[in-house]
């Protein structure tokens, strides 16, 4: 069986005197263990990135979560609080990458910040602080808990009937983790809701009329993916799409 090459988004971070293009180990492990893929990192080169070369190389793209948030001018939002972390290099690399990848049929799976990037890339907007929005619950993790506690199931999501996610399980409602404080406000153009939280917050989206797998989720299915059947089913579906895309390139 073909081992698909999966491009993983990175964050542009400065440590000491130098900048690094880096990605979380849990995403790399999920690509290897949950879908049998070969991970490579996509550097945040903005307009210097050769998208055509990237798309001819990879069989799928995984957009990761991050400690940074999309800079709000990309969705006509108000200025962020001074304590908010942004990553302008990632914004400039990934926001244009998403529609380009979808248009050429590259399978795309977006998680957390990646999910929010997907919405913004299609002219959607974000809540900068979900917990301050009337009627919305607090979706942030409990930082007093250990890592297992922070990533434990936090709330349910209701799946859209006949949607991408609903086809992966017999359940209409499942429990997911929640470690975010930004979230989708206005849904982007050409996007479809795949799951919502009890407070109505959009938790998963897909791209209508995409040529291939194009899904984004707010939660973190890469966390303990081999232990949670629903999370594994999502990576399995992404993996099948990537393997099929790789086979077509032979």
Regions of interest found by a model, annotated:
Residues 215-218:
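Active-site-proximal beta-strand elements of phosphoester/diester hydrolases
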Residues 112:
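Conserved G/P- and acidic residue-centered "switch" motifs that form tight phosphate/ATP-binding loops
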Residues 115:
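The feature captures the ABC ATPase H-loop/switch
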Residues 178:
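Short basic/aromatic active-site micro-motif
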Residues 170-175:
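Catalytic cores of DNA base-excision repair glycosylases
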